[in-house]
């Protein structure tokens, strides 16, 4: 069953494409804007710190997502963001850089709230879970190829204020799409449970499902080294290839193209292989891509970027599908938040480690460590297969049975 046959999902996908375009066009330009205002690389780097910080309290967002209706929550969140980004039209000088940081912080919250994935459980029958994740990742990766260039172009030609208005419009489009959806949502988690047990319920459920915990653990271990790439890639371009920093843009585009192709193929592979084997193949292919960076050749660097771009959708789709299938609707937010928090913390540590090791450790050692870690993740999942749990039906599954 393909999710694209579902009219609700098709409209949701359009809204996701439009809002993703605006999001990535703006938040990637915030760093450029901060640098232009202050002349400081550190000030630009703080933008990405503020983007990451909200992810550290993801379980709180997951708790909220499971206690309310997801569609009204998303509408309220997008409406708030449409107003927040318009504050950027007030920025004129370096002493107003705090507005950029406030917007980045708000974006970080938006990216960390797992309401979108939770809503999918109510919209789609279980048979369409894989194709839905594949379509979403393909669209997001496709958008990310064009949106940074478009965002930077609008910023340079018309200024950050105009870019903020464009982004606000994309949020309005997403709101209109959500408002047009007639969704029968599952009942929210009732009140009455103690706060701490309620907030941490996602971690406890995750631990009780061996397949989910194996996939989440592999993702966390992988993120604990992949952040080294954020530093290693610039050292590799400069010292390994002798290329200008602009070559990073070429690598990013090639990786994005690889991920679009990967998204188109990964749905079929995960459906045939299952979440565990599909994820394992993804990590193994990523290791191959990262390994090509050990040889200082522009051709191999580009090939490697395409290969690991191809791999990313495999383990992303596998983990997202497993969460969709094996987690009840009332826990989707908290389990998604638990997985997101583990990955965010691990990635933040590895990014910081990469920055600290720059100039001390050869970039090839960093890439070798990334490749070996990816192989270890593949082995962790594949060598001791976890039993496949029973699918937890959704309200969409129940409707499908009623209409059968």
Label for each model-derived stretch:
Residues 104-142, 148:
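Cytoplasmic helix-loop-helix junction between adjacent transmembrane helices
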Residues 1-53, 208-255:
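Helix-loop boundary and gating motifs at the non-cytosolic
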Residues 122-123, 164-193, 382-394:
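Helix-loop junctions on the cytosolic side of multi-pass membrane transporters
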Residues 23, 106-116, 307-319:
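Core transmembrane helices of Major Facilitator Superfamily
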